[in-house]
A protein has these predicted regions:
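Macrodomain-like recognition of ADP-ribose-binding/processing modules
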Residues: 1-174
Length: 174
């Protein structure tokens, strides 16, 4: 796994596959919540993307999914959060700015959860399988999964990714 600094969308055309970090929550209108980070940026670039991701989540669950092809790369979801979570007694599984809105034991939407290392690991495993099985995908770029709105540290996430991602994968830090 390689690491670079830069702006992901400027670097994206140099890669065959681009991953955006996502959660598994789907709104009542069928659209996925894409309200932060690179997911929000992608939803602004491709306005139909929340509906596409919402449909993928509804039909396949919280898995890596091919979302769209551009002239330069294929865009994939890279889940880091579940569809929903039961709020822990100490609320430690809810992002800090949302803790006042939920009570322990309540079900909170996945977008309000702290990123989940087991979901990140499964996403890394799935993306490696995608890249392994499709010869047209030789390189893949993704942000540090779970390290922005997911409130994990890179020190927590990096060892999980290193178990699965080889040098075809580049993690970008902005």
């Amino acid at each position: 796994m390689k690491e670079v600094r830069g702006e992901m969308w400027e670097l994206a055309p140099q890669y065959d596959a681009v991953c955006i970090t996502t959660n598994g929550f789907v709104k009542s209108n069928g659209e996925a919540v894409m309200g932060r980070g690179c997911a929000k940026q992608a939803a602004r670039k491709w306005p139909k993307l929340p509906a596409v991701l919402g449909e993928r989540i509804k039909t396949r669950g919280v898995y890596c999914a091919q979302l769209l092809r551009t002239s330069g790369f294929t865009l994939f979801s890279f889940p880091v959060k579940p569809g929903s979570v039961i709020v822990a007694q100490d609320k430690s599984n809810i992002v800090r700015h949302m803790r006042k809105k939920f009570a322990p034991g309540q079900t909170a939407p996945g977008w309000a959860a702290v990123a989940d290392l087991s979901i990140i690991e499964e996403s890394a495993r799935q993306m490696k399988l995608w890249i392994d099985s499709k010869p047209e995908y030789k390189t893949c770029i993704l942000p540090r999964p779970g390290c922005g709105a997911g409130e994990l540290t890179w020190e927590q996430v990096k060892p999980v990714l290193e178990k699965h991602l080889d040098d075809r994968f580049t993690v970008v830090t902005y």
